[in-house]
Amino acid sequence: MAYRQLTLEQAAALLRCPERFLREQAIQGGLPHVRQGDNLLFSQEELLNWSSIHLLDNRKCRKKEQILSEGDQRQERILPGNYCSLEGISPQLKGKSKASILMSLTELAEKTGLLYDSSDFYESLRLREEQASTALPGGVALVHPHSRDEFLFEDSFICMAKSQYPIFFGEENGRTSDLFFVVACKDELHLPVLGCLGRLIAETTLLGDLRLAESAEEMLMTLHKAEQNPSCLLTD
């Protein structure tokens, strides 16, 4: 599938960040781009993949975000719970390895009825983890596809799961993970949802409360309760 090429101005608008920052990242920070004379062009898909890694890396290091930081002064409440269904929540996810957890998460995602091909979805999750782990401090991973190809899933959705056994999922300090979100969102929602979940993880008791939840219903109620915190109110 061909993805559109974005100018520097369009790329900065998509990520809600300064053009200067993106130019610096392209020249010095490894952001994929092509140069046409004095102009920089970006593949929309490569840009979103890079920004996902950048956003999660900043969560790991607790740095001030450089994306999703500036915009048009709108206020928009992004609620991940709106994209969750009970079918996509598991309080007892099976798996004792990263590969088996990814397979179980794919099976959970398939229960939403929104996947076109579960094997393609699994492969996209695997490729994203191969690129860089989505595991964060606190025992949680924000798993998402390497691509948001329109043929991967019909509509945006989020899955939540709590594994029966904490496993090493790639967290940089070697700690295990037992809570997993699968973020399968279209381009316009992908980064805002990742950003909101990151804020909920950092600024609320979401993770601890999810560990106490015993059913899918309780896990969904826990997420909705956490969303009452202003963390998901973007004032860009």
Q: Model-derived features: where do they sit?
A:
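Cytosolic covalent-transfer regions centered on His/Cys nucleophiles
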Residues: M1-D236
